[in-house]
Amino acid sequence: MRIKYTVLTFLLFLSILIFSFPMRGLAGILDNQDYISIESGEGFWWKGHLRGVQVNNQRIGDINISYKPFTIFLGKFKFRNSISEPGISLEGFFGKTLLGDTFIEGLEITLLPNIIKNNTKIDLDNIVNLKAKIDFLVLDKRRCIKANGNGVAEVKDMFGLIPKSIKLDFFLSCTDSNIKIDFTSGKDGLLKGNLLIKDFYEYEIEATSNRLASRIKELSKLNFKKEPSIKFSGNLQQLF
């Protein structure tokens, strides 16, 4: 009987310890000066705030976090996250499954880059504005398992095709275990292509353009069976 009470007391103490773990403790665990910086944490791990979050020296702002306990019966550890700052609005669910998969659900994002606040800014050089929704994105370590989402963005013309900016519709999916984003400017064919995100944030972009093809044909006097395309690659961390 004494052993039983000892075990129950220990489990009760452990539950209280876990339940009362402060958000500032989580902030200390997540804080990595090389990539992630967090000024402070308030509340508890299951409901609280991370203040002054920076990722790769870019200010993200304050993040509100709340745990959804009943999702454990669905095999998930699910958290609702939200950010509301000048230049960025984000709200949705992040978490882990009992199998170890990372997931995002019902995430809505609005970006208005280059909005200055207290001498800091969200600096995404080629994006004028962006609005997107990720219905779901499931990742298994380095593999994309399933994804669905869409959005619209106004981007600066990176290819010298037009003097100002282009409005693009884009669509999220998985292909060959990679995250794939198809984008198009619509029926005008001004710009279309896809972005592949691979291991370790490596990406590849391939884009085609009716206007680019016309210019090349004029200069080369060649008739192409397939539209010429522009390809380049890099690391996503270089974009932030």
What are these regions (language model features)?
Residues N114-I116, K156-M158, S214:
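Sequence/structural signature of outer-membrane beta-barrel proteins
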Residues I3-L8, A27-N32, E39, L168-F240:
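Extended terminal
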Residues I36-N129, K133-L137:
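N-terminal beta-strand/beta-hairpin edge segment
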Residues K4-F21:
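Hydrophobic membrane-insertion alpha-helices, especially the h-region
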Residues L17-D34:
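Short, non-transmembrane alpha-helical segments in secretory-pathway proteins
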